[in-house]
Swiss-Prot record:
The keyword Acetylation does not apply. It is an enzyme of class 3 (hydrolase). One of its GO terms (molecular function) is nuclease activity. Belongs to the YqgF nuclease family. It is found in: Cytoplasm. CDD domains: YqgF (cd16964). It comes from the Bacteria. Its main location: cytoplasm. InterPro entries: RNaseH-like_sf, YqgF, YqgF/RNaseH-like_dom, YqgF/RNaseH-like_dom_sf. One of its GO terms (cellular component) is cytosol. The keyword Flavoprotein does not apply. HAMAP family: Nuclease_YqgF (MF_00651). This is Putative pre-16S rRNA nuclease.
Length: 139
């Protein structure tokens, strides 16, 4: 079963995909979106769903450290509802607290990536971490 992980932000959606057996996650790409213009990248997402033969989505939920839900959680859930409607595939949610911090730390400490380059890959890596955490929890 192929699972697609999404890190939904206000300007981008980081995309990751699982291997066919659902054990490992790898980052795929970052889709630019514009919430104010109602451009959410669904066309590109559809292309990736077909290419990877996706069976399920996992959307990261950016909860606060005290486990409360802020406005970005609402936006992520709305995105999840919309992709469920468009693609007719199940959507699960994964707590994504600290995944962006973890991704940033990995890029700085392990890969020594410059700040400019980090901005180009951080959301994709965060999506990969969200999906891997989900897969680890499920299997």
């Amino acid at each position: 079963m192929r699972v697609m992980g999404l890190d939904v932000g206000s300007k981008t959606v980081g995309v990751a995909i699982s291997d066919p057996l659902g054990f490992t996650a790898q980052g795929v790409e970052i889709i630019k979106i514009n919430e104010e213009a109602k451009e959410f990248g669904f066309d590109r997402l559809g292309e990736l769903v077909k290419e990877y033969q996706v069976d399920k989505f996992v959307v990261g939920l950016p909860k606060n450290m005290n486990n409360t839900e802020g406005p970005r959680v609402e936006a992520s859930k709305a995105y999840g509802d919309k992709i469920k409607e468009i693609f007719n595939l199940p959507v699960d949610y994964q707590d994504e607290r600290l995944t962006t911090v973890q991704a940033e730390r990995m890029l700085v400490e392990q890969a020594d990536v410059s700040r400019g380059k980090r901005k180009k890959v951080i959301d994709k890596l965060a999506a990969q971490l969200i999906l891997q955490n989900y897969l680890d929890r499920m299997f």
